[in-house]
Amino acid sequence: MIITVLHSHVSFYFIILSFLFFHALHLVGSDGATITIVNRCSFTVWPGILSNSGSGDIGTTGFELVPGGSRSFQAPASWSGRFWARTGCNFNSDTGQGTCLTGDCGSNQVECNGAGAKPPATLAEFTIGSGPADPARKQDFYDVSLVDGYNVPMLVEASGGSEGTCLTTGCVTDLNQKCPTELRFGSGSACKSACEAFGSPEYCCSGAYASPTECKPSMYSEIFKSACPRSYSYAFDDATSTFTCTDADYTITFCPSLPR
């Protein structure tokens, strides 16, 4: 009988400790965010990933993603960086070397190794909150940017979050079909920003135009904004283009308008 009672107490305490352990794991897991990349395009893309200075590694800086494919990453608390799609890539099966038609990062490899996208490219940008370590900075910030031009449609969706707008953002319109001739890249595989096309300070928000009061939307950025109202169309397009959420996970979808 004594043995039975002791065994019951041990079982009870084991259950309590197990509960506390898994609860602690849940709290640890809530730091950072899971970011999933989905390719709904009818063609293969090679996503590029650039972590900002001081941010941790999330496992890769570039990879191949076939139509219908997906891949997830755990971005740690306080991570910031960007994602984009490289298209028209050709990598040698023996050497691994090659280049991409749009979004190329100049590494000459599938991995971008700390290099960013060469414009034009549609960008998804994130700053993940610091979590419980710093409650003042717990919110995530995210956006889809056309400041460096456009190459593929993109959507960013937040799931499971709170304490913010947590809205879906992106550009589902095929801007390559609406691209002005003077902004067209190559045979029409991408659309340059006015800054990339002309290099003028008023388009690049640089020099005397490096402030929100001086740099205003141009006729070209308005074309982007009209087609994709929640995306950044020029450098100071913050008010309608940056979104926040807390404790969320995110899905980046390339070519989201195609059937699932």
Curated annotation (Swiss-Prot):
Family, as annotated: Belongs to the thaumatin family.
InterPro entries: Osmotin/thaumatin-like_sf (IPR037176), Thaumatin (IPR001938)
Protein name: Thaumatin-like protein 1
Induction info: Accumulates locally in the root vascular bundle upon P.fluorescens WCS417r and P.putida WCS358r bacteria root colonization prior to induced systemic resistance (ISR) and after ethylene treatment (e.g. ACC).
Signal peptide: 1-32
Tissue expression remark: Expressed only in roots.
Superkingdom, taxonomy of origin: Eukaryota
Function (record text): Involved in local responses of roots to colonization by non-pathogenic plant growth-promoting rhizobacteria (PGPR) fluorescent Pseudomonas spp., but seems to not being required for the establishment of subsequent induced systemic resistance (ISR).
Natural source organism: Arabidopsis thaliana (Mouse-ear cress)
Phylogenetic lineage: Eukaryota, Viridiplantae, Streptophyta, Embryophyta, Tracheophyta
Cysteine disulfide links: 41-255, 89-100, 105-112, 166-245, 171-228, 179-191, 195-204, 205-215
Phenotype seen when the gene is deleted: Normal induced systemic resistance (ISR) mediated by P.fluorescens WCS417r toward the pathogenic bacteria P.syringae pv. tomato DC3000.
GO biological process: defense response; response to bacterium; response to ethylene
CDD domains xref list: TLP-PA
UniProt keywords, alphabetically: Disulfide bond, Pathogenesis-related protein, Plant defense, Signal
Pfam families, A to Z: Thaumatin
